[in-house]
Amino acid sequence: MGSEMCIRDRPALNLIGHLSGIATATGAWVAAVHGSGARIRDTRKTTPGLRRLEKYAVRCGGGMNHRMSLSDAALVKDNHVVAAGGVAAAFTAVRERFPGVPVEVEVDSLAQLDEVLAAGADLVLLDNFPVADLAEAVRRTQGRALLEASGGLSLDSAAEVAATGVDFLAVGALTHSAPVLDIGADLRPED
């Protein structure tokens, strides 16, 4: 029993430390935006084979999951916009092709935001927007769609970003850069 424990303890402790680090980091982000109404969400950037566990750790830390897989929701990204010939066209094509699936649209300018709002988007990812532009996006949207700030976020800027009125902060670092907690286990001789 003791030798088997010595073989298996390090991988188990590494996994526990990794997941605990994610939960702890998420908790810090959640605390940073407390009282603002904004929620912390993870992204699709997870470790292969560990997605469910990492997303569970985010929930344990008080955050929300963006999506578990492509079947949960569609995310229209910049490459889709180029392929479709515009952000509104990309959104409309996905909405028509998958009518029952929630569609989030990534925009990188206020002009693109206006286009997707006119097309009927109900969830918009604001990519690398400065804080002033986030506030302007909230003003322009007037509650017609949920807004998610993404890109360039830090724990130090989280409260300021949340104060703009966005609904979500998308934080990829929760799963791809969270520090691993130092967790150990010691065997003790039987009495």
Provide a role label for each language-model segment.
Residues M1-D108, Q112-A119, A135-R140, L146-E148, ...:
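Acidic/glycine-rich phosphate/pyrophosphate-binding loops and surrounding catalytic core
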Residues N128, G151, A173-L174:
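Short secondary-structure boundary segments
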Residues A132:
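Glycine-centered loop/turn positions within well-structured domains
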Residues A173-D191:
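Short, charged, intrinsically disordered terminal tails
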